[in-house]
Amino acid sequence: MKKYLIILCSLCHYHSVWAQQGNYVLLQPNDGYKGIISKAAHVVPSPRQLRRQQLEITGFFHFGTNTFTGREWGTGKEDPKIFNPTALDANQWVQIAKDAGIKQVILTAKHHDGFCLWPTKTSNHSVAASPWKKGKGDVVKDVSRACKKYGIGFGIYLSPWDMNAAMYGSDAYNDFFVQQLTELLSNYGRIDEVWFDGANGEGPNGKKQVYDFDRWYKLIRELQPTATIAIMGPDVRWVGTETGYGRETEWSVVPTNNLNIASITEGSQKNLAFKPQGDMTGSDLGSRDKIINAKGLVWYPAETDVSIRPGWFYHEEENDKVKTPEKLLDIYFNSVGRNGVLLLNIPPDKEGLINNSDIAALKKWKQLRDNIFKKNFAKNAILESSNGINAGLILDNNDATHFTTTGNDTTAIIEIQLKTKATFNVLQLQENIRMGQRIEKFALEYWDGKAWIMAAQGTSIGFKRLLKFSTVIAVKLRLKILSSRLNPCLAEFGLYFMKV
């Protein structure tokens, strides 16, 4: 599922709401360097962004006519009669996802070929024209109900590009798309996420479409106000690759440089969408060098997406190419463990079931994670901070509480005396992002009986940071916060052991 790099950050329409929540701030010419850093430290996620970050792992179900043609991208000319999953079981999909630790799933309700997995009133190119359940089936309903049954979130992917729609490339298509979006947002209960990608190819008439994103966002906020709008939307950005690997330094607070500041300040509703200047897929998005010349700053966290297979749709010939549990674990460390949310695609097969190869990999992946994180060797440790308060809160297993420094200190040292000597090689850190993302550099050292030895070091933390390092046996350690934007707000600290 390749994306055209048209990463659209449509943020200004809901600025008035964001301003109250603190996930957006305007920068003024007289702010100065310290003022800008202070403002950056106070940008925080909206409630919907916080809820989504706490999910950590979400799932994708790519399913449609491509499943039956062997394609990744269809043509829009597929005969709906080819869609006939003989054993479709959405409960199986969702249960397998939940058992793997996935907290929310997204279904491709319509991919670029235009085939709709629900009986839409807008087009004949849908499940209603297929032999599946004699045209009475509704995949969106099945998955929605399964998510409710198993207690996980449900989201929809709706491709703006539609190779089948005759009016694509005209103003009428935006009306058509709004009708489809309205059906999905109105008839299937709570929708937790709407996922748009940036593909914008030609329709049947050879024309491309000017997407009315501002209108779509307004509709989503009206009909499903708690839903996040991802990728081509204001709440979540694409990390920039489909490998599952995030940046070493991942800031959720990033610049926006082409706002009409006056219009936003006055609450104008005329400019509902804008494209940010700069590359949202670059290697550095939120460092001091990047934010210092910005016009505004916004909380715009990263999503890291990858498929469990080489392709996004199911292909039988890829059954022996499913990612290994060990590879999935490495992806987890480099996505969730780098301040991102992992979106893992698990495509159902032609029968309408998750393949056994995928199931086996997912089960073992969950076991590997459970084995690592079942015991925090720092639990019940004695903590002493050089210049802060509530150091013990970093061991309370609550990401809403935190240690912070006194006065204006932006650095700190927390000494950790374990109950007994322990063997560990994984560090987990979390900030209380309700207070913003602040920590810029940290280091973990252990006492070998003679001197302090470096075990691990890193830059940004955000919601979660995981670092693997050479195995250490120690009883005394110290965590050094070396740089922070204002007072650091460290929520959690953990030491774990991973078999290598």
Predicted regions span which residues?
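Asp-box/BNR beta-propeller loop motif
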Residues: 1-4, 447-454
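Mature catalytic domains of secreted/periplasmic carbohydrate-active enzymes
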Residues: 20-408, 415-417, 423-430, 437, ...
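Inter-blade boundary loops/turns of WD-repeat beta-propellers
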Residues: 432, 447-449, 498
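Short beta-strand elements bearing conserved aromatic residues within extracellular beta-rich modules
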Residues: 442-444
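Exposed low-complexity, polar/acidic, P/S/T/G-rich flexible segments that act as propeptides
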Residues: 487-500
